[in-house]
């Protein structure tokens, strides 16, 4: 995947201890926007100094999951975005696999990973690499086609 096709958005609230594993799992050339739901200037300075690929936005207050992610997504200039929780980390081929799925589907809004450790019909009976439709996704990692996602109006902040 070309690094100019994807931006990673990480919405945080006092996640100083958790976020380093997450950011260390991201390629240094990959653009990352961290939305910190506080006014912690020290956190912003430290994170931007340590990770040259990271832009940190301070909100001044806790906006929550939907509004914080929408703020981060409003700054994205790439075709795709990956919403990632600060306590999640990427495996080596995660971004490549998301892009492969995106190229297969084309008009998707959101793609999410299937977790092998959760019991579900798909985990037990389907090919692990198969793409299938679900009614909902876990919010810890969501790959967005921003053209389609904008059409549905981003995350509901209500």
Segments (PLM) and residue ranges:
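Short, well-formed alpha-helical segments that are part of the catalytic scaffolds
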Residues: 12-28
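A conserved acidic beta->alpha catalytic loop
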Residues: 25, 36-44
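A recurrent flexible, glycine/aromatic-enriched loop bordering the glycosyltransferase active site
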Residues: 127-147, 151
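Donor nucleotide-sugar recognition loop
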Residues: 150-158
């Amino acid at each position: 995947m070309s690094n100019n096709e994807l931006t990673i958005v990480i919405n945080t609230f006092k996640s100083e201890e958790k976020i380093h594993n997450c950011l260390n799992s991201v390629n240094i050339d990959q653009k990352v926007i961290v939305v910190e739901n506080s006014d912690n200037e020290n956190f912003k300075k430290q994170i931007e100094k340590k990770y040259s690929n990271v832009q940190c936005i301070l909100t001044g207050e806790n906006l929550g999951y939907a509004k914080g992610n929408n703020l981060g997504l409003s700054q994205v200039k790439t075709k795709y975005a990956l919403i990632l929780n600060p306590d999640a980390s990427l495996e080596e081929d995660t971004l490549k696999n998301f892009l492969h799925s995106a190229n297969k589907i084309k008009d998707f809004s959101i793609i999410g990973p299937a977790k092998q450790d959760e019991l579900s019909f798909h985990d037990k009976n389907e090919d692990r690499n198969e793409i299938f439709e679900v009614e909902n996704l876990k919010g810890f990692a969501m790959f967005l086609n921003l053209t389609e996602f904008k059409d549905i109006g981003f995350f509901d902040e209500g």
